[in-house]
Amino acid sequence: EAIGYIQAQSEHAQELLDFISSRFSSPTLCGLLLGKAARAREKGVELYFDPACRLDRPFQPLGEQELISIIGNLLDNAIEATQRSPLPHAPVEVLIKLSDQELIIEVADQGVGIKPEIRERIFERGITTKTRGDHGIGLYLIESYVTQAGGAIEVADNTPRGAIFSLFIPATGTARQLEDTDYAT
């Protein structure tokens, strides 16, 4: 029975590795996603990656570290919100998709959700839904990175519970690219 469990875990890990490495070209992003999936699983939460996921070339409007920070913070928040839910843990759904027009990052959880009075201020520095620890910077950073790149963020309630964070970042013509062009002349 233990051998069967180990084989199943190994197969799952290999399938996830194959999926992620075939859809994301950045080794750093692949490492982040695999690490977050393993950490989530240890906490009793599964990450479900949408089959449409694809980021197979560098995304110029954001630096790799900014992209990693955005995705890492969104996943951490969703995993923690899911853990705090008293109901059985539904998977955290993840979509990271680059088209010619934009990069879409969407993370949907069925955790504890966001109270309306906090939602209005969720991107302010120091605002958090968490009760312990040093929090309140992640969403502030995400919002600043997305805004600098000329993008937008939508926060919605998930059904039947939880939250959906959707980020839309244009692939061209961003404020950052215009600044870079100014400095180059």
Map each language-model feature to its residues:
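Conserved glycine-rich
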Residues: 151-152
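Short conserved segment of the HATPase_c
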Residues: 114-126
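Acidic ATP/Mg2+-coordinating residue in the GHKL
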Residues: 109
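Conserved short strand/loop->alpha-helix "switch" segment adjacent to the catalytic nucleotide/phosphoryl-transfer site
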Residues: 21, 48-70
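Conserved ATP-binding N-box helix of the HATPase_c
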Residues: 64-87
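Detector for a conserved hydrophobic position within an alpha-helical segment of the HATPase_c
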Residues: 146-147
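Short beta-strand/loop element within the Bergerat-fold HATPase_c
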Residues: 89-101
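Short beta-to-alpha transition helix within the HATPase_c
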Residues: 4-7, 21-43
